[in-house]
Amino acid sequence: YHSKSSTKLVAKGIHSTIYSGELTCLLGANGVGKSTLLRTLSAFQPKLDGEILVLGKDIDAYSDKELSTTIGVVLTDKCEIRNMLVRELVGMGRSPYTGFWGKLSKDDKRIVEESIALVRIEELASRMVHTLSDGERQKVMIAKALAQETPVIYLDEPTAFLDFPSKVEIMQLLHHLTRKTNKTIFMSTHDLELALQISDKIWLMDKANGISTGTPEDLALSGHLSNFFARKGIVFDKDTGLFRIDNQFSRQIRLVGHGQKYAMVRKALQRNGILANREVESNIWIETGDLKTTHFIIHETSGGTYITQTIEELLAYFDTEKS
């Protein structure tokens, strides 16, 4: 993009397609240019070179009126909206069709109600916008974009201010909407784990290597994901297709058991620098039992046993042993 004194090149050599009926997530570090790319794709700012085709037509050939009925945009900004009902805000999505006075026709009102129903916020429709939580407000903005009836919707970090359950709900909602409406939905996000589990396609944006695209699984198999996030302390687990913390282990302990208790003990020990699994050979070992048992058994080097009721007590045992 152009600034007053220079031209800033954010990314080049992008050759990719965003498809209808799919949720595509744009991932990248802070400052890499995700928002700039979204603004360019939305025609909010001019591209420096190349072409952007929307439904087979160059974006520069669209009039403002045509763009308003082709591309809907949901931004991160938290606007303070007062004295407006949710239904009225969703109705503003119909502004490209209502003319100067903005009066909703019977058909416009039907589309507004359908958009509210698609996002499942019927119980919020008569609430004042300023009384909503961040998650509820984000749903309303998505409903507004749906009411705009554009085949393409761009979202700039729609989960940025949400708690984890709300993040999951918004991501699942967007994925559901791509299937239900066959719209093209493209969003930037920092929620890596959710994007890998829910999105259909991923765009990895990196200053050094440009943009890599594909399904999360293909990017995992090709090594793009592990290379993209390669840094100390983070490891891409090829078995799960997700990232995990790369703990540095100071000792190893054999762990016997199965199910949830085994997994939770293993996780707690690894967080505390102890590699624990069934394959490890050690003089001391831990028996986790299953959910029917209420304790954990530590088999000591001396041949004796030490029983703990909680994982916290189990960790304290090894802290005491170290000291």
Task: Name the predicted role of every residue range.
Residues 42:
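Helix-to-loop junction immediately C-terminal to a conserved catalytic motif
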Residues 91, 106-124:
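Conserved ABC ATPase "signature" region
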Residues 103, 128-132, 136:
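Conserved ABC ATPase signature
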